[in-house]
Swiss-Prot record:
GO terms for biological process: vesicle-mediated transport. Keywords: Glycoprotein, Golgi apparatus, Membrane, Transmembrane, Transmembrane helix. Glycans are attached at N11. It comes from Coccidioides immitis (strain RS). One of its GO terms (cellular component) is Golgi membrane. Belongs to the TVP18 family. This is Golgi apparatus membrane protein TVP18. The chain crosses the membrane at residues 16-36, 39-59, 82-101, 106-125. The keyword Ion transport does not apply. It holds the Pfam family Cg6151-P. It is a multi-pass membrane protein. Golgi membrane protein involved in vesicular trafficking. SMART domains: Cg6151-P. It is found in: Golgi apparatus membrane.
């Protein structure tokens, strides 16, 4: 299945996964920029989210990167739509708290994390099976890992 066909499939877990990829990039870039401002703690939190999301959204990385069995077990918890919606909601909530101090660019990461969480929640509520994008190492590769 090509990338265009994946998007036409109307499977919200595919939309959530690609929004998650955008979150990885935003989380790293904005987190790095925020480390050099007065949002140091939240910038570091955002930087930590980036590799965590990378391992969640690109399942092939668990196969090729040397990680501990505890970390692998933690990442494998997020193989269902409900669990992915939960982790995205928690991450988004963590960055929404940064607004208590002052509005910053971290809100962009929080918004995209919330959107990805909503896509996964919609997929779960519509009882769509979790489908990993073929481009990101899914469809066969993801099944070997889990």
């Amino acid at each position: 299945m090509s990338l265009a066909e994946e998007f036409k499939s109307r499977n919200f877990s595919i939309y959530g996964q690609w929004t998650g990829v955008i979150c990885i990039i935003l989380s790293f870039a904005i987190g790095l920029a925020s480390v050099f401002s007065r949002f140091i703690v939240f910038g570091i939190i955002s930087l930590v989210y980036s590799p965590l999301l990378l391992f969640i959204e690109v399942p092939f990385l668990l196969r090729i990167c040397p990680t501990s069995s505890k970390f692998d077990a933690f990442i494998r918890r997020f193989t269902t739509n409900f669990m992915r919606a939960a982790i995205y909601a928690a991450m988004s909530g963590g960055l929404w708290i940064s607004l208590v101090i002052d509005p910053s660019s971290l809100i962009a990461v929080a918004v995209f994390l919330a959107i990805a969480g909503l896509f996964y929640l919609l997929a779960a509520l519509m009882k769509q099976e979790f489908t990993s994008s073929k481009t990101l190492g899914g469809q066969g590769v993801a099944q070997m890992i889990v």
